[in-house]
Amino acid sequence: IKFLKKINNSYFYSEGNRENLFFVIEIAKILKIKKKNLLKTLKKFKGLEYRQQIIFKSKNLTIINDSKSTSFSSSASILKLMSNVFWIVGGLAKKGDKFLLKKKNCKHLKAYIYGKNKNTFINELKNIVQYESFTNLKILIKKVFLDIKKNENLKHKTILFSPAAASFDSFKNFEERGKYF
C-alpha cells in the first residue's frame, strides 16, 4: 500500500486502470524489476489517448477525454470516483445498455446529452441525474463552459467526455470524436 501511494498518478484512479496497475505490479515482482524503476515509470505513465485521458488540470477544474467509452458501464466506472461532474454523454446507444449507478451516487452530476439516440439516454437517465439535451456537440460544449462559469463556487469540477455510446452517428470513429472534443 505504501508503494501505491508513492505512485500518485491520476491515470490509475479508475477501477479498471487500478486493476491493470495491480497486474503490472505483480508481473514486475515476477520479473524482479526494481521498485524504484517501476515507480519512476508508473509516475509518468500517461495511458492511451481518449481512454480516461486528462487533457487539462488546474486547481479547480479537470477535463477528461474518455471518447473510447461506448457503454454506460465504462462511463460509470469513472463517474463513481468523482463529484461535481459535468458529464457529456451521447451518440449511438448500445441496445439493452443500462445505467446502473443509483441516484444517491449522482448528486453532484449533470449529464449533457447529444446524438442520434439522445432520447434513449434521456429515458435511461431522467430519474437519476439532472440533464439537458442538445442537437450537437458544439452547442453542448459551449453550455458546459457556461455552467462551469456559473458554478465557480464549486471546488474540483470535472468535465467528463465519456459518451457511453458508439460515435458513428456523427464521427468516423472514437478517435475522430476524441480529437473533436
Residue positions per predicted region:
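Acidic-glycine-rich active-site phosphate/pyrophosphate-binding loop
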Residues: 1-7, 54
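Nucleotide phosphate-binding/pyrophosphate-handling subdomain across enzymes
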Residues: 10-108
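A structural signal for short, well-ordered beta-strand elements
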Residues: 31, 130-133, 170
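Phosphate- and divalent-cation-binding pockets in alpha/beta enzyme and binding domains
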Residues: 74, 120-121, 170
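C-terminal helical cap/extension that packs against the catalytic core
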Residues: 97-157
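Short beta-strands and strand-loop turn motifs
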Residues: 159-164
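Glycine/threonine-rich flexible loop motifs
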Residues: 168-175
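Short, basic/aromatic-enriched C-terminal tail that caps enzymatic domains
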Residues: 176-181
